[in-house]
Amino acid sequence: DSAKHCGLFVGTVKANPKAFNLDDFLTTKTYELNEIKWEVAGMPSVFSQDALDLGTHLLLQHLPQNIKNDVLDFACGAGVIAAFVGVRHLHTFPDPNNRPNLHLVLSDIHALSLYCAQKTLHLNNLQGDVVASNGLSNVEGKFSHIITNPPFHKGINTDYSIAHSFLVQAREHLIEQGHLTLVANSFLNYAVDMEEHVGPCQKLISDNKFAVYQAVGIRPKAGHNKYKQRK
């Protein structure tokens, strides 16, 4: 068009085309953090398909060590977070007879992300449930920990409503004293919504680009309306 926003190409296939196989576009990357190595399946348009993004890297560095029981990786993308948690759990507790229970649930709205997430679990010999869900609409049960690098884009457009709706509903999916840990760009002050809708919130760490927040799923005390920053 005149604004050079798009172009149209027309061609004719003369040879017999190869049958479409989704796995032809699948890639596998090895990530490493704090002596933990894990495999991640990727595909075009899937978040973190090429490398561990800086925000998720900061989040994983500051996750609690005692994550167990039911864990939700919300907006999981390729399953980077859940796979790290699962592999670290196996590394921390090598004896299966003395290993605490860990049940991973991975949710996303994006079909290719869900496909990659399932592949990522398989690559790391992990068990988990991969759930197609618009926000938390199809996610069932309550979790001891919800972990996320929530999206704030829909396509190429900025959309803060995704994270806001998630935070409004998150406490209903946490057990009492359950934890919600997320990373966000520093200019996105999710702590206010976390404090209001989830429970007492603190900033675990921040740099010049990202901040990691953690909230505890209880009702705040009267007058408690300011998140705490760890000293």
Residue ranges: model-predicted function:
Residues 54-148:
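Conserved SAM/SAH cofactor-binding pocket of Class I
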Residues 177-184:
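Conserved beta-strand signature within the Rossmann-like core of class I S-adenosyl-L-methionine
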Residues 4-68:
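SAM-dependent Rossmann-like transferase core, predominantly class I methyltransferases
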Residues 7-28, 206-231:
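Core SAM-dependent methyltransferase catalytic element
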Residues 1-4, 41-43, 200-208:
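Conserved S-adenosyl-L-methionine
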Residues 185-198:
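Conserved class I S-adenosyl-L-methionine
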Residues 145-157:
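A short SAM/SAH-binding and catalytic strip from SAM-dependent methyltransferases
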Residues 164-176:
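A short glycine-rich, Lys/Arg-flanked "PGG" loop and its adjoining helix->strand segment in the class I
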